[in-house]
Each structure stands twice: as C-alpha cells, then as structure tokens.
Amino acid sequence: VRGLAFVGALLAAAAAAAAEDSACPPPPAAIRPAAETVGTTPDRTQIEARHFTSDRRTGVSEFTGEVRLQREGQQVFSEYLRYDQPQDRIEARDRVRLEDAQGDVFATDRLELVLEDRTGETGPGTYTLAGTRRGARGDAERIEFAGHNRTILHRARYTTCPAGQDDWFLEVERLELDQAADIGTARHARVRYFGVPVFYFPYLNFPLSDERKSGFLMPRVGHTDKSGAELAVPYYFNLAPNYDDTLTPRFLAKRGLQLQNEFRYLGRSLDGRVDLEYLPSDDLYGDNRAAFHLRHRQTFGPHWTAVVDLRGVSDKQYLEDFGDRLEIAAQTHLPQNVEVRYGGPLLAFGARASGYQTVDPAIAPLDRPYARLPELRLTTSRPLAANRLNPTFEGEWVNFKRDVGVTGSRLNLAPGLSLPLARPWGFLTSRVAVRHLAYDLNEAGAGADETPSVTAGVFSLDGGLFLERLTQIGGRALTQTLEPRLFYLYVPYRDQDGLPRFDTGVPDLSFESLFRENRLVGGDRIADANQLTAALTTRFLDEADGAERLRLAIGRIYYFADRRVNVPAGTDTATASDYVAEAAAWLPANVAARAFLQWDPRRGEAARASFYLQYMPARDRIANLGYQFIRDTIEQLDASAEWPLGPRLALRARTMYSLRDDRNLESYAGLSYHSCCWAVRLFASRRLSGGTTQVNGIHFELELTGLGKLGEAPASPLKQGLFSFPAETPSRGGGG
C-alpha cells in the first residue's frame, strides 16, 4: 500500500489562482489547530485526531475530534472518520473537507472515498477548483469522484466569482470536470446572471484553463433593422497548435439561417485566414447570399514575400445588408490581388495579378476598373548616395484586361541619373530621366494606332536651406528652423491624345505633391511641365529631447507655360496653383493637432480643408475631434472618444455628421462595465444606408470569466480607425 505525505502549500495555490485578477479577493486559507493524538496505519497513511480506536482483526479504525488524514497529496479533515484499511476506503462525517493534490477543495457533511482510485461520492457540498481558470467554485447536491482528475457534479452550480459574490453562475443537472483533458462538460445548463436565467444549453463544454479547446463558444445576440433579431452559436475546432476553425450557425429573424466559417493558420513563414458566409434562400432578398475573403502572406527567405487577398460577394446588396460600417457598405468594387515581391539591396521586383469584383451590376462596363493580368515592376532600391552620381531605374509592364473597350499592354520605362549634394546647411539635387511609354492594344478602333508610344525627357532641380535659431515659448527652450525650398521641373510637351487611359487620374493637391515629377497619377501620361514650386517650412524642436513640437508649412506651384497634357483632355492656363498649407502641433497636456488647407486665391475660398484634434492623457483615455471639407462635395464632423467613467465603467463612442446635408452619417456608442469575474457591454449603432435610410443596430455582450462571451458586439466599428485620425486629408485619387 502506498504511503502519502502532507502537502500544506496546495491551499495557497488555490488562493493565488483566484487572486490573479486584482479585483477578486483571494479565498481565505484554512487554519486548523494542532492535533493531540496521532495514528499511523501500516500502509503509511497518516491520520491525526483527538481520539481513535482500531480493530486489528478487521483492519478498521475510527477517529474522532479534529481528524486529519494525509495520503499522496490528498488531505481529509472531519470530526469523524472511519478507515477500512483492507478496502482502502474511508467514510467521513461532520464538517468534512477534502483537499486533493491539485489544490481542489470539497466541503460536505458526508464523504465516502476509495483513496487509491479516488472514487466515491459526497452528500450536498461545496467545492473550489484551484487548478481551473480563476479558481472556479460552486455547490452540488452530490459530488461524485470518478478517478484522479475527474469529478462529476450533480444538480450543481458553477462560477468563477469570489466567495459571497454570486453575480453569475452556471446551473446544471450534471457537470463533468475532466482536469486531465482540461474540459468542463455540462448537461442541461442554465446561465443565471444576478439570478435571472439568460441562456439555456442542453449541452455545453468549456476549457477549465486558458488553453484552447474545441467546443461551443458562448452565443452572440443582437438586433438590426436590416435583419431583425440575431442569434449565433459558434463552435470552435482546435485542430492543431497552428491552425483552427470556427463554424457559426447564425439565425437572422428576418432572413433565415446563415452559416459563417473562419479558418486561421500560422506557420514559421506564413499566416492566413479564410472567411466564408452562406445564407440559403434569404427570406427578404429571395435568393441565396454568400461572401468570402481569403488572406494569405508568406515569406521565402530574407527577400521574397507573397501576398494573396481575394474577396467576393454574391450580390450588390450584400455589403449593404451585412456590412457593419459605412465604409464597408459603400464599396462598389472589391479588390482581388495576388502578388510576389522581392526586395534586395540593389533592386526591387514585383509581380502582381489583380482585379475587381464590381458589386453593383448597374455600373456601366466602361466605368469599371481594369484588371492587371499581370503587372511586373522593377526599380532600383539602393538609397541615393550623397555627393555622387546615382543611376536610377523604374520599369513597369502591365497587361490591362476588361470585357469592353480598349485593352492591351503598357510598357513604362524611366531610367535616370541623380546627383544629390548635401551639406548640414542645405541640399541641392539635380536629376535627369527619360520616360518612355509603349502600348500593344486590342480593340483600339478603326484606323487607330495599335502600338502607340511616346518618349520625353524629365529634368528637375530640388534645393533647400536649413536655417535655425534658439528661441523660447512659454519658458521652454526651443530650436526654430526655417527651411525654404525651391523645386524646378521641366518636361517637354508630347502629343498623347491617341494614348489610352487605363489607370491615370488627377490626385488631390497636397504638400508632398508640390514636389512630384508627374502631376498625374498612373502610367498613361507624361505630363508636360515648366514650373517652379516655392515652399517654406518652419519647425520648433524641443531642446531637451529634440522632439518636434510644432511644424508649419506653405507652398505653391508657379507655372511658366500652359499645361497641355491633362485628364480629361484640355489645356490648363492658370499661372499658379492653389496655396497648400499644413500644420502639426504636439502640445503640453497630451494634446495633438493637425490641419490642412488648400486655398483657391482666384475664388478667394478654400477648396479643401481638414482639422484634427486629439487629447490622450492616458492609454485608456482618448478624445478626438475632426473636421473635413471638400468644396461642393463634403463638409463633415467626426468625433470619437474612449473614456473611463469610473473604476469599472467605460464609454466608447464615435459619430460622423454631415454639415452639408445636415444628417448623421454613422454613429456608434458602447458602454462597458467589468468586475473581476464578468463584464457586460452594450453597443448601439446607426448608419446611413442607401443614401437616405438610417439603419439601427444594437448588440449585447456578456463575458463570463471562465466560460466565454454571451453575445459579441462587432469589433470593427470600435477598433478599426475609430480612435485615430489620418495624417493628411484623404485623397480621392484618379479613376480610369
């Protein structure tokens, strides 16, 4: 018969597990007086008690008065204990407390147990499981011990809240705790939250620790105007340490049953995710609905990278019906991209196949973007060395595909030489290049040249000074810089009216675009230029740490000749561009601000403007205010905040409001409250749909420590782009 040694430190382990969350008090440790009488059985099971009797003939001993039994990490405390040595069986009564080798504690008034096998049962009692997440505890009408690391609770309650705080508990007919497999399995389980039943599960399993396990996750609940009440019950498949899958049946009251699936994988040099959604016979739409999104990224050695991003939907209304943000619902073209990139010390190479799914079939075929099947790029990647001649090269070959209109391939070459001269007080960079465009076209039209080409030289001269002085603002020592900059660009005119337009457009004017060698974006035009950019920047740098506290910049382009290459075709006769100014400030008290202005002096008004203000005194305290204006198009406010309202209560909110149209574009608001063993979140949303209709949604999320989440508010509205603002006013870009 095996002996056993007393392990008194296991109670402390249970207390430490429950105290992992600082908001949860640790359970009180047991304190027992020293025993006066000690009995040691021949099998080295140690028993202490005030009194005991023993029958050598039957091998049965009885102990009374503060009894303590120890054996192989197990301890039993009681006022009465009967030990049958031949059967290795004990019967204990009156204030019985069993502590096993894992630190789990069971308290009852009756215990029958075979010590070697750990099989037996108790009467009504309570339990604390130190080896589980947060130190789970509860009570049961009967506790059955079915071997080491396996316990079955009958008509039981289970919670991870501290003693005396039954905020939530799982009420079950049968709960099996398999600590070797790290799984809790419940039959006929009800989740009660402050005594109110909120969910019923005929079957439920959950991990006892923080390790990933297969099984049902807690349901997600919500309601939207588009789909009505929502209930989703995810099932998680822990397939391997490096990949998993979640299958989610999602019931939508107005639409039917939708299936969602998320597959994730991770390797040493790769990672990816596949999302699938399928809704057979949408009750509102009257047809099958589906969506997919595949993302994959992989590296091959130190220089090669592959990226795959493919997505698609079944119909034009899918994003409108199921997208949870305005920017998603408003998409008209879904990008599809497969790319391989090489980045070496001298050259960078890229090969890409890309296309789009046009979500709205009403968009005319001639207004849809071209697919690039394929696109090849080659550029020099070495940084320019100062005070020496540097060869540069940019090359691109693209095959443009579309069902209608002109298609074909385009070759774009731009070899060049750069001579950067640099000194601490200034710089001067001269550059010459030759740009060559050549096409091989299909469906060019009767009499049109199917292999047009054009070549033009490019010359630029970019120079600036760095002037500085010491100054003080508000008693703070600062270095102020003054950085005048001139950029001259000359590109001769070449007739390009016969060239196709696959991807070229006019970008929004920005401070950086004042110094571009091509005022157009895309590769179909070599824009003629004879112009000079004059710009001035001043910075205020903190003498203490060198940090930039304030930056102001203004610039303008002066034209010495009319621009004859334009999109759309025509001649631009203006003698100067709009003024472009920007400012950025990092102020005391954790305040940051950024502003942009494009001023049209001919009309005496702003063409574009934006302003963003951010206050962030702590990581969990942030408030943003933004304003954006585009003449005749957009004037809107954007405000967001994440702020604690108390030690456990926090607010998250965002709203975008159109001043031009006097209406809300999109709003989110969420309140969250967390205690040591549960958290609750209420999330409400409202966004514009179809240009005129407001769509409302509400989601409820209850997170129970040790079980999971009951409901789940969509993460994207509150986590993606909500609490930060762009550095510059977004560009609308150019279209093809």
Predicted regions located by residue number:
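N-terminal targeting/secretion presequences
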Residues: 3, 18-35, 157, 309, ...
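Outer-membrane beta-barrel proteins and related beta-barrel translocases across Gram-negative bacteria
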Residues: 104-121, 125-159, 163-174, 178-736
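Post-signal-peptide, soluble extracytosolic/periplasmic N-terminal scaffold domains
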Residues: 19-147, 233, 237-239, 265, ...
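Hydrophobic alpha-helical elements and their junctions with loops/disorder across both membrane
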Residues: 12-19, 437, 491
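Short linear sequence elements within intrinsically disordered, low-complexity coil regions
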Residues: 11, 35-36, 88, 507, ...
